[in-house]
Regions:
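Two-component histidine phosphotransfer core
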Residues: 1-143
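C-terminal end segment of the histidine kinase catalytic
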Residues: 145-149
């Protein structure tokens, strides 16, 4: 909560802080679902010295929790960070269920649209976002160049 209140108003934060916030969010979701949802969280590479816009990655993970748990048999969410020489490869993958159209809320898709706008404004020509949405799986793959200290 402290990160969201105090650090998120800065223009850049350390990648360590952003990952700590995401890890805490994932741990909270694990407790919430008490083992009913498999949530993997992996970090590969060195995050020290890298900086990122705060709260940039959380909407992808929140989206996976929102859409990857309800109406899903044996739900899973995979979150993987790979950092190599200031290059971030961030992947979020979740199993999808069959949601009826009348169950979808009006805000569906707004979080991803906002992140796309932020990426275009803050990281022009420094990112590639690939979204794969099939009947069974939703996957986001973000590759971007991070600022170095």
């Amino acid at each position: 909560m402290r990160y969201m209140l105090y650090d998120s108003d800065q223009s850049m934060v350390s990648l360590d802080r952003e990952l700590e916030y995401l890890r805490n969010y994932v741990d909270l979701q694990r407790m919430r679902f008490e083992g009913d949802v498999t949530i993997d969280f992996e970090v590969h590479g060195t995050v020290r010295g890298c900086r990122i816009e705060p709260m940039l990655l959380i909407p992808f993970v929140e989206n996976a929790v929102k859409h990857g748990v309800s109406f899903v048999q044996e739900p899973y969410i995979h979150v993987v960070f790979s950092i190599d020489h200031g290059q971030l490869n961030f992947q979020v993958k979740n199993k999808k269920g069959k949601m009826k159209d009348d169950v979808k809320d009006e805000s569906s898709g707004i979080g991803l649209k906002n992140v796309l706008r932020r990426l275009d404004l803050l990281y022009p020509n420094q990112h590639v976002l690939t979204i794969c949405d099939t009947e069974e799986v939703f996957e986001v793959d973000l590759q971007m160049t991070l600022q170095q200290n």
